[in-house]
């Protein structure tokens, strides 16, 4: 079931905009790239937008799709609670993700989100 608060990134340009923000948080099983967006990009509701990618280094197509499904399930469980509402995220599966348990994947995603929130808070304080 698709979470109504999450919108999936599908276009290459969206992925490139998130990567160009240079906010990257690395964990053993995934890399989280993040970028805040403004309401002019996403509309008034400002949903959480997320994209998933898994490279061929992770395994063949069957393995990559399994990793992508597990990352998608973890994101749908974690992002609505812990993520900033006006953000775009790209979750990149790493080779270690194929052997990790679901609880480990969600823990890694939470830790990456905590790092992102800390960095966002620090940048807001510096801007003031």
Identify the residue ranges that each predicted region occupies.
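Positively charged, solvent-exposed patches that mediate nucleic-acid binding
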Residues: 1-128
